[in-house]
Amino acid sequence: MLVRPCKLYAEQVMSYKEEMSQNGDSFDGCAGLEDVYSFDEWIDFEGRLRKKYKTGYVPSEVFLAVRQSDKFLVGMIDFRHPLSDFLKNYGGNIGYSIRPSERQKGYASEMLKLVLPICRDFGESKVLLTCDKGNVASQRTIIKNGGMLENEI
């Protein structure tokens, strides 16, 4: 399930950050989590991202992907709207990541499936996702959710 960031998940968010850092992963969809030292600092920044944070930025809606059975944080996803010129080429509307210990379990596909109706609620009938050419797992996730290759840069 997707939930908005809140204090209830503070320890798990910081644990997520630690696991991603130790694995050397990029923090796609994490709303600057890699650049903060505390949950409070991150939640403040995430709140500012929901508005037009600064010139060149667009509003961003951030969600935590929480496994229903045990309320464990498995991933993060953000939805940026509307597309800026930069996002049209790099990043797209949606960014996401799955914590290393929870990969290959279908969570990325489920997160994307759950966020698409939210995108429509914000007036985006068509969304752009980007991924590196060599990221086969992300390509499969996008295709599984109805995406198609538009172009390569």
Regions found by a protein language model. Name each.
Residues 95-98, 104-117, 121, 139-144:
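Conserved acetyl-CoA-binding loop-helix of GNAT-fold acetyltransferases
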Residues 119-130:
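Conserved GNAT acetyl-CoA-binding A-motif
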Residues 1, 95, 128-130:
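Short aromatic/hydrophobic contact patches that present stacked aromatics
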